[in-house]
Regions:
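Acidic (Asp/Glu-rich) sequence patches and key acidic residues
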Residues: 1-155
Length: 155
């Protein structure tokens, strides 16, 4: 389960932000995953991961689709990473002087980000409870990919 934001860079006359400029704007650590889902720090690719070095969780995926900026957050994740995701969206929107973006293909306003933080925190809790119910006493395990290492839940 994930949530995806699409930020449209509309202005014809303004210079468009590129991935490296977005990374610098966020102030976050970054890297890419190799074919074994290991993080290669300080690398930029078509899909780049943003994360907080002091509170690593699952990371925010950043990529471009033509001039659109896309950010994806995998759930479940930590409350601090959910907040960081919406703070990152707000930073980008404020830099572009826009108030609206697409959240899972629905147009929303950055002023509603606090509401979405709450939604995603509740969705994360729900997903963890669902995993717990599915694993129960059975010999079953779920893998959730973290920014540095996979996290195994279950037996």
């Amino acid at each position: 389960m994930s949530v995806t934001a699409r930020i449209k860079q509309k202005s014809i006359l303004k210079k468009k932000l590129k991935i490296d400029e977005i990374i610098n704007l966020t102030g976050l650590s970054y890297g890419v995953s190799d074919e074994n889902f290991r993080l290669i720090r300080d690398e930029i690719a078509s899909h780049t991961l943003l994360y907080d070095e002091t509170k690593p969780a699952r990371g925010i995926e950043l990529w471009m689709d033509n001039n659109d900026i896309l950010l994806s957050l995998s759930l479940p994740t930590s409350p601090s990473e959910i907040k960081m995701y919406y703070d990152t969206i707000a930073k980008i929107c404020n830099t572009l002087k826009i108030k609206k973006y697409l959240r899972d293909d629905e147009q929303v306003n950055i002023e509603d980000n606090d509401k979405f933080i709450k939604y995603d925190e509740e969705a994360s809790i729900g997903a963890l409870e669902d995993i717990k119910n599915k694993t129960g006493n059975a010999y079953q395990r779920f893998e959730i990919f973290g920014i540095f290492n996979p996290i195994s839940i279950g037996q």
